[in-house]
């Protein structure tokens, strides 16, 4: 089939690679001049299936109220006159029950674990190098209360067969010797021995190069305007550089996906949640992290990427704003300096922000839509790097009519569409409206 993939971030590029490997004729369209220049550019660098957790969790509403008065709050909500934001926040609240949390986390861990296996396969077959490390990740607790609260996640990990170690403060130092100066601020930690780290940007650019060598066409600097629909079926994409005809279209545009599919009658519950990172050159390797340390208090991940430290995290619900407030940089610098003081030169840190495409339940939307020829691979939130390879493999299997290797029925848009809407005929779609 002729397949057009919209988006050249890590999700779009892995999708294109898998589809081309399955024998399809693939074209990737992206508005940027190269791959991985938006949300995939400078993320936290962790590949953490065991930490795959929805933001919607029991206790989050109360915590969000307390965070409103914190200088270094992990979550900031900036209210807007935006119906999509209101719907997103209300849907988040509905998912904050213990039952919903357990279901959503289990689904996320399932996809993330599978994705790690797929990434291992890709690394073996392609030989790509991306500052990767297979040395586990450590969730660091600064209080006994945080340590006690981890019991809920541990039960999910145990049920899913995910290997882990529950550590005291000395155990944390054994895993991450660079934390020794912060010993008095550590209550314990949860270490996932199977987790990995790596530079998402390097990986995506490298895989895009291999995909291009394998016949995938990349059309950079090309803006997507609308989907082309004929006879109730998507037949291509209209762009700033002409029309691309296709037998199937995969939407992997992250936070921009809902605007494109909305004219077709699809309400895709993906909303941008802003994240930040700084990248710091290492000046003292002995004080630097070995792998990833997740500071549970501030929801910040501190990751070793070769000769650099990537410090990323926080969540800001502020629409599509791409501003870089100095206060966010200050929080990131504070966290890494508090735990790994002297490891990096903060005066030379680069500051970045990206829009993570979040769903209310934390799980991406992967699979077919009610519109013939239209497929989705979007909404991975903070876990695009963790889930990309597995999501791409699942998508390729579904497009080819193969049963994926993991349960995938609960990954599609169907979980957000009422039964009566699923049955509506495709002729009701409106292909003429501008998508965004």
From Swiss-Prot:
Belongs to the DadA oxidoreductase family. Pfam families: DAO. This is D-amino acid dehydrogenase. Gene3D superfamilies: D-Amino Acid Oxidase, subunit A, domain 2 (3.30.9.10), FAD/NAD(P)-binding domain (3.50.50.60). Oxidative deamination of D-amino acids. One of its GO terms (cellular component) is plasma membrane. Its EC number is 1.4.99.-. One of its GO terms (biological process) is D-alanine catabolic process. It catalyses: a D-alpha-amino acid + A + H2O = a 2-oxocarboxylate + AH2 + NH4(+). Keywords: FAD, Flavoprotein, Oxidoreductase. InterPro entries: DadA (IPR023080), FAD-dep_OxRdtase (IPR006076), FAD/NAD-bd_sf (IPR036188). GO terms for molecular function: D-amino-acid dehydrogenase activity. Its cofactor is FAD. FAD binds at residues 3-17. Pathway: Amino-acid degradation; D-alanine degradation; NH(3) and pyruvate from D-alanine: step 1/1. It comes from Cereibacter sphaeroides (strain ATCC 17029 / ATH 2.4.9) (Rhodobacter sphaeroides).
């Amino acid at each position: 089939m002729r397949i057009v993939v919209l988006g050249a971030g890590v999700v779009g590029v892995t999708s294109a690679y898998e589809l081309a490997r399955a024998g399809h004729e693939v074209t990737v369209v992206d508005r940027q001049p190269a791959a991985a220049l938006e949300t995939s550019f400078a993320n936290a660098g962790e590949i953490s299936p065991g930490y795959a957790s929805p933001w919607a969790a029991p206790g989050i509403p109360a915590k969000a109220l307390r965070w409103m008065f914190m200088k270094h709050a992990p979550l900031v909500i900036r209210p807007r006159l935006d119906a999509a934001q209101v719907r997103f926040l209300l849907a988040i609240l509905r998912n904050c029950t213990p039952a919903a949390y357990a279901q959503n986390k289990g689904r996320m861990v399932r996809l993330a674990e599978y994705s790690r296996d797929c990434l291992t396969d890709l690394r073996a077959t392609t030989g790509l190098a991306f500052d990767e490390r297979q040395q586990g990740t450590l969730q660091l607790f600064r209080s006994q209360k945080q340590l006690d609260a981890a019991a809920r996640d541990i039960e999910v990990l145990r049920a899913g067969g995910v290997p882990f170690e529950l550590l005291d403060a000395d155990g944390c130092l054994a895993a991450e010797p660079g934390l020794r100066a912060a010993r008095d601020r550590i209550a314990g930690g949860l270490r996932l021995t199977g987790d990995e780290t790596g530079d998402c940007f390097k990986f995506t650019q490298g895989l895009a190069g291999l995909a291009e060598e394998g016949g995938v066409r990349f059309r950079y600097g090309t803006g997507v305007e609308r989907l082309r629909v004929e006879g109730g079926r998507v037949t291509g994409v209209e762009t700033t550089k002409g029309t691309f005809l296709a037998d199937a279209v995969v939407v992997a545009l992250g936070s921009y996906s809902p605007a494109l599919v909305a004219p077709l009658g699809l309400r895709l519950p993906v909303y941008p949640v802003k994240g930040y990172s700084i990248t710091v050159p290492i000046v003292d390797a002995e004080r630097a992290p070995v792998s990833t340390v997740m500071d549970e208090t501030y929801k910040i991940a501190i990751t070793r990427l070769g000769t650099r430290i990537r410090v990323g995290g926080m969540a800001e619900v502020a629409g599509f704003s791409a501003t870089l407030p100095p206060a966010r940089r200050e929080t990131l610098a504070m966290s890494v300096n508090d735990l790994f003081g002297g490891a990096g030169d903060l005066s030379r840190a680069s500051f970045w922000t990206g829009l993570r495409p979040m769903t209310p339940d934390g799980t991406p939307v992967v699979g077919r839509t009610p519109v013939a020829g239209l497929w989705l691979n979007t909404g991975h939130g903070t876990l695009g790097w963790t889930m990309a390879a597995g999501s791409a493999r699942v998508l390729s299997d579904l497009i080819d009519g193969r049963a994926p290797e993991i349960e995938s029925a609960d990954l599609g848009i169907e979980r957000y569409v009422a039964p009566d809407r699923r049955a509506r005929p495709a002729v009701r779609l409106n292909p003429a409206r501008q998508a965004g």
